[in-house]
């Protein structure tokens, strides 16, 4: 049998225990198992007083993992899934996401259904859903200073105790637009239910080939979220004298200076999710975020008597 992988959050004892148990179970079935933590997918934050260390996205693949793996099981919460997507997308390995955290918005399976999920996985009774990822680069002239893959979003915003920011945003060859706000978010359809949603952006179904630009606390009544085709690159030029903070998927980032620019484009590496049942996005929205729930009782009109 071909080899498979297990990626787990080693900061969670429960995930560590399950990873060891799964490794033994799969080996007993005749599978070769390669084990890795999600740590290499967590890029961390650059210190403003040190030189940024440019890490190519392909270098985040765990040691021993390659394109020959049939699939990988990811054990952890949504943060672990975001990290694992960066680790597995460059080698095209699909992942079964198993929630050991809290919300588990990106989870396909849960611990109570794990034995049945493994049985189905080993029999090959699953489908694969591709999710678009963004490639985010910080450039100074033509030099790449920092880059990362993003499954959810990139947020570029001011530091605490600094004033409002100004950005010049160019999409493809269109005329650039100016935005005055505390920051901007660029998200994928997958990320439309995360930070972007909290900032007033729309929910986008995962199969739509778009990105969205969402201003954070804009200083304009006319500044609204913009949805645009992901075939066009976006470049963000800081138009403010202070340095800015960039955060990718909530767990990686660096400082962006006035002389830098941020280039965002669709990655050639999609994240591949294993689906054990037909994916019903609206069901997930309803169960996880309470979207579209029926009103149990409507407020009554005031008594006019």
Swiss-Prot record:
NAD(+) binds at residues 78-79, 152-153, 182, 193-198, 251. The keyword Nucleotide-binding applies. It is found in: Cytoplasm. Pfam families: NAD_kinase, NAD_kinase_C. It is an enzyme of class 2 (transferase). GO terms for molecular function: ATP binding; metal ion binding; NAD binding; NAD+ kinase activity. The active site is at 78 (proton acceptor). It comes from the Bacteria. InterPro entries: ATP-NAD_kinase_N, ATP-NAD_kinase_PpnK-typ_C, NAD/diacylglycerol_kinase_sf, NADK. One of its GO terms (biological process) is NAD metabolic process. GO terms for cellular component: cytoplasm. NCBIfam families: PRK02649.1. Involved in the regulation of the intracellular balance of NAD and NADP, and is a key enzyme in the biosynthesis of NADP. Catalyzes specifically the phosphorylation on 2'-hydroxyl of the adenosine moiety of NAD to yield NADP. HAMAP family: NAD_kinase (MF_00361). This is NAD kinase 2. The gene is nadK2.
